[in-house]
């Protein structure tokens, strides 16, 4: 965007106006890469450092040429990572905002952590979750992943279900700062045309904004609601055993499908 980053410093000032009513965590789903206006950049970084409860996003850049893993599965390797500008990076917790889309373009899974060039990066919702646990003294839940380091997203809400409040209304003082007491505030694009909306399994005909997807993932982390796809061979074996058992029970009790219809 073309705003001076000083507006984000002003937002933090509004949200943290009352110490006893400040949010637990404030997460920016906005890529603050590169230098903009020095004064605004410095103001935002200083406000974030003073807040001590701020997370921001990085973004992986993937190769356009796919490769194959050991199982022959096609994937696009990471070729670079875009980080927040240095002063902000030193003041906040950083997590990547990329979402994993299946071949049909639907976001069903999240990769909580990814390693590139020897460095492990955490996903934005996990960074926010870890910061929340740190600030509340809560032991983080163990995140169950499959062999590709993915976990299925258990969506709690459909597009538009999470409460959205206008950025400008907060800046203008139209929203009582106590509204955000002990909450997690995510700041991100919430309007069509900003190229941050995706197909989701429960979206029906509507797409979901990236910040809403992060909110759903975060809620799943907090509620310990993780799941992964089962082993298809194990599922087949169990299914076959179940069918055989039902067949034996039907014969033993002389129950036939024709008699049930």
Question: Residue locations for each model-derived region?
Answer:
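Non-transmembrane functional regions of envelope-associated proteins
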Residues: 1-146, 180-257
């Amino acid at each position: 965007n073309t705003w001076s980053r000083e507006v984000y410093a002003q937002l933090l000032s509004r949200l943290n106006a009352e110490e006893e009513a400040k949010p637990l965590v404030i997460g920016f789903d906005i890529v603050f890469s590169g230098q903009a206006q020095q004064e605004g950049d410095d103001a935002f970084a200083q406000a974030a450092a003073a807040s001590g409860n701020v997370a921001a996003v990085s973004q992986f850049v993937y190769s356009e040429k796919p490769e194959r893993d050991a199982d022959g599965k096609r994937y696009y390797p990471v070729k670079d990572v875009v980080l927040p500008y240095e002063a902000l990076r030193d003041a906040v917790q950083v997590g990547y905002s990329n979402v994993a889309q299946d071949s049909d373009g639907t976001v069903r899974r999240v990769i909580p952590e990814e390693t590139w060039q020897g460095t492990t990066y955490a996903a934005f919702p996990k960074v926010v979750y870890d910061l929340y646990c740190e600030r509340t003294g809560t032991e983080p839940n163990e995140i169950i992943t499959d062999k590709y380091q993915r976990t299925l997203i258990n969506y709690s809400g459909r597009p538009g279900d999470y409460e959205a409040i206008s950025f400008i209304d907060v800046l203008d003082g139209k929203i009582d700062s106590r509204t955000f007491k002990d909450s997690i505030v995510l700041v991100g694009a919430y309007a069509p045309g900003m190229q941050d909306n995706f197909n989701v399994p429960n979206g029906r005909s509507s797409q979901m904004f990236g910040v809403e997807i992060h909110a759903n993932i975060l809620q799943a982390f907090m509620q310990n609601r993780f799941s992964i796809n089962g082993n298809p061979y194990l599922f087949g074996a169990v299914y076959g055993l179940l069918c055989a058992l039902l067949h034996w029970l039907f014969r033993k009790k002389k129950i036939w499908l024709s008699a049930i219809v």
